[in-house]
Amino acid sequence: MHSSTSQEIDLLLEKAKSSGKTEDLAALWKAALELPQWHFITRQTANIEDRKPFVGVLDNKPWIFVFTDRQRAQEYARTITGGGFVDESGNVLVMSTDTPKAIDYLLALTSQGVYGVRFNELNGWFSPLQNLPAILQHVQRG
């Protein structure tokens, strides 16, 4: 099975942004869904068990931040000054989760009041979580 690369995702993102076409956005989602893992940033905590994927508030709405590769996750975490994402030795903690598990996690967050998902924040795309089931259906049908 073909696995998407960061570069492909960037190209698909540019295309979807410039064309605004549904099928270009669907291609982008498809590429993201085909990745073996999705990556989350998490704050440093005393107990590893307490670490949870970062949910940030933008426009007064809680969003879950997801990254298509570890490097992007680290880059974004470093932009948040005093966010607690970078440890004393300068490492960012990234949680990598198998994509099907990550999707289940995102779907479960809807009931916890999380509004949406933001992929590759800095240069990415986003969607309300309530649209996720329809996106999954649409992409998996295609």
Task: Identify what each model region corresponds to.
Residues 1-142:
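An interfacial alpha-helical scaffold signature
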